């Protein structure tokens, strides 16, 4: 339970585990239920396109997302995969929505074990592939 009184739905944890353990999804989008009591799955996707993921982020509303971020490592070491947690809170979102999402984030974040990086986005430049790649590769200790 978060400071806002919002809890995490079982389906939200199941979708995360399906992404993390089963590689069933590439990303999961989470939102807060209409009655503002539960963090629920809004959408899951198997699309490999990061641009498609970015296209799902609403211009005027908040959400949370988990993304299985793959990237190449230099020196022919191959690909790495890191699970990234996004808090999307655009400047144009309603203040009340931003407050509820900010105060509910910890409940979801604590429930999702195995996340490598946290990204807070208020505009698309903060969640661009290059920006996330830089953050993820730093947390992995490879440059």
UniProtKB/Swiss-Prot annotation:
Principal localisation: cytoplasm
Family: Belongs to the actin-binding proteins ADF family.
Protein name: Cofilin
SUPFAM superfamilies: Actin depolymerizing proteins
GO CC term (a single one): actin cytoskeleton
Domain ADF-H: 5-137
InterPro entries: ADF-H, ADF-H/Gelsolin-like_dom_sf, ADF/Cofilin
Gene3D superfamilies with a match to the protein in the record: Severin
Gene name per UniProt: cof1
Cell compartment(s), UniProt: Cytoplasm; Cytoplasm, Cytoskeleton; Nucleus matrix
Reported function: Controls reversibly actin polymerization and depolymerization in a pH-sensitive manner. It has the ability to bind G- and F-actin in a 1:1 ratio of cofilin to actin. Binding to F-actin is regulated by tropomyosin. It is the major component of intranuclear and cytoplasmic actin rods. Required for accumulation of actin at the cell division site via depolymerizing actin at the cell ends. In association with myosin II has a role in the assembly of the contractile ring via severing actin filaments. Involved in the maintenance of the contractile ring once formed.
Keywords, sorted A to Z: Actin-binding, Cell cycle, Cell division, Cytoplasm, Cytoskeleton, Nucleus
Origin species: Zygosaccharomyces rouxii
Source superkingdom: Eukaryota
Gene Ontology annotations of biological process type: actin filament depolymerization; cell division
Gene Ontology molecular function terms on file: actin binding
Signal peptide boundaries: none
């Amino acid at each position: 339970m978060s400071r806002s009184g919002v809890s995490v739905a079982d389906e939200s944890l199941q979708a995360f585990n399906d992404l993390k353990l089963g590689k069933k999804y590439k990303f999961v989008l989470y939102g807060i239920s209409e009655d503002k009591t539960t963090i629920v799955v809004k959408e899951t996707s198997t699309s490999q396109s990061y641009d498609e993921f970015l296209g799902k982020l609403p211009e005027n509303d908040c959400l949370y997302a988990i993304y299985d971020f793959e990237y190449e490592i230099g020196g022919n070491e191959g690909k790495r995969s890191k699970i990234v947690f996004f808090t999307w809170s655009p400047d144009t979102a309603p203040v009340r929505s931003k407050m509820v999402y900010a105060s509910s984030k910890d409940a979801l974040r604590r429930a999702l074990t195995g996340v490598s990086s946290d990204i807070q986005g208020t505009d698309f430049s903060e969640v661009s592939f290059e920006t996330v790649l830089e953050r993820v590769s730093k947390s992995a200790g490879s440059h």
